[in-house]
Amino acid sequence: MELEFLYDLLQLPKEVAQPTEEELPRGGKKKYLSPNSKRNPKFEELQKVLMEWINTTLLPEHIVVRSLEEDMFDGLILHHLFQKLASLKLEVEEISLTSASQRHKLGVILEAVNQNLQVEEKQAKWSVETIFNKDLLATLHLLVALAKRFQPDLPLPDNVQVEVIHIESTKTGLKSDKQVEQLTECKSHKDQPLQDAFDELFKLAPEKVHAVQEAIVSFVNQKLERLGLSVQSLDTQFADGVILLLLIGQLEGFFLHLKEFYLTPSSPTEMLHNVTLALDLLKDEGLFSYPVNPEDIVNKDAKSTLRILYSLFQKHSLRAEGGGAHHATPN
């Protein structure tokens, strides 16, 4: 058995049953919520608020949800909830008794939900398979999205994050890793966004924004030159978190082990892990306190990306000039 495989298995919490290779065929994948995340009071509060919201919404239809994990999988409650929220009628069976009919019903419902939320199927954090297989994380992502769309004033606990353990069966055995997923936004960022120089900057003429972007691109490329990397687009090239982590490592003298991040992220979840790690590093160093949602970076939000890079530019550009010329905050 290889040492890397042993290392990976040691990272799996004892409360999570380790699947055997017989249970998980070659190439198969499973994921689990970490026990600590399940016991997190904010995670429990999120489920409670969502259940109360569903039960209140469906009270006239005498439908009661007792467990989001167990009661949502067959599409019955989701069918009634979405029809009520969206004020429309879906042409599906009221009660589906077989697995095939339940999956078909879920497919029709989720297609309508995704269309209403303007989310492409491949970008959605839920699917027919995950909902049908009682994936609590996927179910919560779906319900949070519906709540934000149809009842934005619902008092969801802010900044709910969970640690997810991924298990994959490879040719050398079982491999595991951990990722952090964001379920709800930072409340101060969502409800009371702080006004700073970048809020004002983006109200100015496009050429002003472009000038700031060019200055920061030049700074970034100068620092990444020794790695043989270059950046042309701030909006897109920082979305997966890789260049951001490498830049922070160069500027702050961090050494990041390859086990800590994804060098070639292949999914939004892996990109989110990288960006979350980068923001945590910046906060730990006292470089950044503005409440940025990691998902905004992954979704290529120009203002959020520029705000983060400017915090590095402001510190290290001044240091390089020995305190000479002063770089004013963009406004």
From Swiss-Prot:
<dbReference type="GO" id="GO:0005925">
    <property type="term" value="C:focal adhesion"/>
</dbReference>
<dbReference type="InterPro" id="IPR001715">
    <property type="entry name" value="CH_dom"/>
</dbReference>
<keyword id="KW-0206">Cytoskeleton</keyword>
<dbReference type="GO" id="GO:0003779">
    <property type="term" value="F:actin binding"/>
</dbReference>
<dbReference type="GO" id="GO:0005886">
    <property type="term" value="C:plasma membrane"/>
</dbReference>
<feature type="modified residue" description="N-acetylmethionine">
    <location>
        <position position="1"/>
    </location>
</feature>
<dbReference type="GO" id="GO:0030036">
    <property type="term" value="P:actin cytoskeleton organization"/>
</dbReference>
<feature type="domain" description="Calponin-homology (CH) 2">
    <location>
        <begin position="210"/>
        <end position="317"/>
    </location>
</feature>
<keyword id="KW-0963">Cytoplasm</keyword>
<dbReference type="InterPro" id="IPR028433">
    <property type="entry name" value="Parvin"/>
</dbReference>
<feature type="region of interest" description="Disordered">
    <location>
        <begin position="18"/>
        <end position="38"/>
    </location>
</feature>
<feature type="domain" description="Calponin-homology (CH) 1">
    <location>
        <begin position="44"/>
        <end position="151"/>
    </location>
</feature>
<keyword id="KW-1003">Cell membrane</keyword>
<dbReference type="GO" id="GO:0005856">
    <property type="term" value="C:cytoskeleton"/>
</dbReference>
<dbReference type="GO" id="GO:0005737">
    <property type="term" value="C:cytoplasm"/>
</dbReference>
<comment type="function">
    <text>Plays a role with ILK in promoting the cell adhesion and spreading of leukocytes.</text>
</comment>
<dbReference type="InterPro" id="IPR036872">
    <property type="entry name" value="CH_dom_sf"/>
</dbReference>
<dbReference type="Pfam" id="PF00307">
    <property type="entry name" value="CH"/>
</dbReference>
<comment type="subunit">
    <text>Interacts with ILK; the interaction promotes the establishment of cell polarity required for leukocyte migration. Interacts with ARHGEF6; the guanine nucleotide exchange factor activity of ARHGEF6 is essential for the PARVG-induced enhancement of cell spreading.</text>
</comment>
<keyword id="KW-0677">Repeat</keyword>
<keyword id="KW-0472">Membrane</keyword>
<keyword id="KW-0965">Cell junction</keyword>
<keyword id="KW-0130">Cell adhesion</keyword>
<comment type="similarity">
    <text>Belongs to the parvin family.</text>
</comment>
<protein>
    <recommendedName>
        <fullName>Gamma-parvin</fullName>
    </recommendedName>
</protein>
<dbReference type="GO" id="GO:0007155">
    <property type="term" value="P:cell adhesion"/>
</dbReference>
<keyword id="KW-0007">Acetylation</keyword>
<keyword id="KW-0009">Actin-binding</keyword>
